[in-house]
Swiss-Prot record:
Cited InterPro entries: AMP-bd_C_sf (IPR045851), AMP-binding_CS (IPR020845), AMP-dep_synth/lig_dom (IPR000873), ANL_N_sf (IPR042099), MenE (IPR010192)
Keyword Magnesium: no
GO biological process: menaquinone biosynthetic process
Annotated function: Converts 2-succinylbenzoate (OSB) to 2-succinylbenzoyl-CoA (OSB-CoA).
Recorded superkingdom: Bacteria
EC number: 6.2.1.26
Coiled coil: none
Protein name: 2-succinylbenzoate--CoA ligase
Pathway: Quinol/quinone metabolism; 1,4-dihydroxy-2-naphthoate biosynthesis; 1,4-dihydroxy-2-naphthoate from chorismate: step 5/7; Quinol/quinone metabolism; menaquinone biosynthesis
Amino acid sequence: MYPWQDFAIQPDFSDKIALRTTQGDMLTWIELTTKINQTVAFLQKKGVNAESAVAFVGKNSEKILFLYLATIQLGAKVLGINPAFPQEKIAKLCEFYQIDFCFYDKDLLNLQEIDVFTQKADFFRPATMTLTSGSTGLPKAVVHNVQAHLDNAKGVCNLMKFDCNQSWLLSLPLYHVSGQGIVWRWLYCGAQLHFPEDDFYASLLKTTHVSLVPTQLQRLLDYLQENPSISFATRHILLGGAHIPTELTQNMLKYGIETYSGYGMTEMASTVFAKKSDRKQGVGQPLLGREYCLVNDEIWLKGAGLAMGYWKDRQIVPLTNNQGWIQTKDKGIWQEGELVIIGRLDNMFISGGENIQPEEIEQVIIQHSSVNQVFVLPQKNKEFGQRPVALVDFNEPFSKSAVENLMFFLQDKLARFKQPIAYYPLPLMLEKGIKISRKQLADWLAKRDEIN
């Protein structure tokens, strides 16, 4: 049996709350499993079987979650697609990955329960396909089985003290590996999963655990400061997606909220390294069951959460090298007992003969109190070949004085050749998911340079 089926028949769990909906309604494990069975019946009526590949397009909703789990229960493969993608790209993805059925949230209305054929649970069968945030062309579809998701979940639950008496907010999209990571931690423990309600931060504070990106953490801190008398259940926050300002995590401690910073990737089913946030730059040590090694400064990974491969031509193509490791293309060093991520090997550029790693510069810039988010990119330069420029989102309107303050701050913190020669407002309209694409930013910068 799959976890939800198991909890539905266990006396200690069957009548316990499993899910809190966007409307604030509660579903027990029995009621949840009934909803999933109704969705299984819907899928079977449409012709979905164990050999099918099914896609869903939509923002997080109860029906999308039921579809995700029902597809797995049927033994089919499920692929989530970002609803912000243009229709043409969605069609191209479905064609390229030979998707048999594509459902939108509006397709999942009026589900009725009928007798369903129950596929025997197979934890090692291909179950999920998750798109990577590919920088060029179509993203790759990473295939995981249920066991890999549960193995990944176990390590995070152990670190963050997550058990059946806790709750986690589904704050990240299900089409992204980070959103799926939340679901599998919930299913690993038999805990509660909460959907955000209209007031995101009010519903967040009803949960014990939550996953956020740093900009959301800053907004949460602002919310707590604006509502000093509010009571809250939140005690643990997993951070990801960008550089994390130390001042921000230290401020959360004043509210009794522990934050955790880490390092993960789609191919490993989410988080691989993590630790309680501190003043050091590293991401901690590998979580339970993960293995790593550094080869010519490149991080290689295997172990708990490792994907089966990439989906191509209705087959699974291996993603590991001959030694069984996935080569991440991330540059890292082991320092003071933990892994420190230097940046992407393919982000590095040369300026006047000097190697420049953009993430190293970003790590310094983000420590300035006025900076929410920053990306450093190479800009063509006749004398040096390329020079660094910074795209910045300040927590105040972008202005000459804000830039000058930042430049003064960097004078004694970065070597001169690493200091950006120009600053531009970060074009936030490019944000389509959890993180902004460097490729899109580079294209935006190139067009800007052409115009000027």
